Amino acid sequence: MINDGVAKAMKVNSMWIDMSTSVPEAALNVKANLNQSVAMIDAPVAGMSVGADKGTLSIFAGGNASDLERAKPLFDIMGDPSKFFKCGEWGTGYAVKLVLNMLWFNQFVASVEALMLGVKAGVDLETLRKALVGSPCQSIMLERDLMGLLNDGDYDEGFAVALACKDLKLAGDLARNVGVPMEVHATVENIYRRARARYGDRAGEMIPAKLYEDDTNTLLRIK
């Protein structure tokens, strides 16, 4: 829309709100192409389609403080007001979303790897999961996010592995731009790339678990 004339046609004092997942540099590029009277906010979200339907999304907003206040009534309708985060200037909303996605993928792979290790060592899967939930390793991943996979073999096709790989690449790009070494991220990204190559772009975001299952001939399923 930046290049097809929409930006130049925006009215004075209107707002450009981008809710996609991108890199901070994208916000600066958009702002540079907007009329100075047009406000720019980057406001990616978390909560998936369920959060969108229920109006309970988490929103991570970057932009001028006055612009964020002006847009907040809209955000309060779309998301949970207690989960509206003013992240800083332009691009910081994008940065928070990339960090969130990267950490979720890291936690997912680490959790699957840990569970597979315990199961192959002879521990009952549900006993192992409950032991971890009741330990300092407790996490939403072990309590909630993995349950569709462990109970039903659901690799979560609601978010494709191709999109997961895109987000991991963007997180890596951000890390290189700001000079942060990301060795764990690099390993997780490689695992996701291998899963994408083996199972296809449309496989779900939890498909890396199938790499472990196929390579060990062991399903991670609660009996």
State where each predicted segment sits.
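Rossmann-fold dinucleotide-binding core
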Residues: 2, 21-101, 105
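Short amphipathic alpha-helical/adjacent loop interface patches that line ligand
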Residues: 3, 14, 27, 168, ...
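Short, conserved loop/helix-junction motifs that constitute active-site signature segments
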Residues: 6-12, 77-78
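A short helix->loop->beta-strand "cap" motif at the edges of active sites that frequently abuts
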Residues: 10-14, 36-38
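Mobile acidic interaction elements
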Residues: 13-14, 30, 221-222
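Helical "substrate-binding/catalytic lid" subdomain
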Residues: 92-215
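Hydrophobic alpha-helical segments
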Residues: 215-223
